[in-house]
Amino acid sequence: MSGQYKIMYSSMDQFYDQTNGRMAEWVSQLEPWVKACENLGNMECYQGKSAESVKTYLKEVHMTLLTSIQQAIQLYRTKYLFYREGYYDMEGDLYAVIPQKTLLSVKDRMKTEIEDVSDSSLIVQTSLLNVSDLIALQAPNSYYLKDSMEEVKQNVTDFNQNIIDYEAQHKSEANGELADLLQSLFATLTEYYTNGTNVTSYQSGDCFGNSHMPELCQHVLTANEYLKENAEEIELAEVKMQEVFAQQYEDACKAREEEGAIKLLTGGAAAITGILAIVGTGGWQLRL
């Protein structure tokens, strides 16, 4: 990661919710296109050499491109879902805010405090030695305190490094198969747009005249295999996120109820105070 990070669970959840909604819209917009291609391909009354060329073109080109877009959307969604869920293994608080600046500050503070404890322990030992001829006193043992502080310092260091490694891992994955699929899809679409295709004379296999189509098909197959192999994990991660959003909704409702109760109490207290003030003046006063 470049610069200092600040992990905010609420922001990541909001981003997940927004992108999930947007991608659901995209998928719903693609479905009529897929259905239209299927219907035209199965239309028995649409016959003839040119008609068969069009049907083959729709099946091999349009359906491949539509499927590629769907796979890219699903792969992106899955990758982010796994990325988001993985943070709960490091910190389970639904509303966690993790600034690297704070972690590094705690680490530095622990280092300083450990040094201070060592210095203080040495001063105490020296002072006791100065009166050893008068009274024998055992110097306090600072070992356990320093050991506990060292443990805190190490835990903070490890936690910070875990986040750095985790971000680097997912950045690498994002620049891997997902990026390759998107780049191949864009290159394939660009070549079709630039060179065009004679639909009425299209023959089966002509799609591979597009130099990027074989690579795109391979990336789609790889993505499909990944989604199949991780189907169970995807389902569990989706359930986890549903539980998170349900808990956040419950917490928000509870917070609103408590806020409303506080406002009612405050309003009631103000009303009582107002009544007492009016009674104290001897009667109700008209508001002009």
Predicted regions and their residues:
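Intrinsically disordered, low-complexity charged segments of secreted bacterial virulence
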Residues: 1-264
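Membrane-active amphipathic alpha-helices enriched in small hydrophobic residues
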Residues: 253-283, 287-288
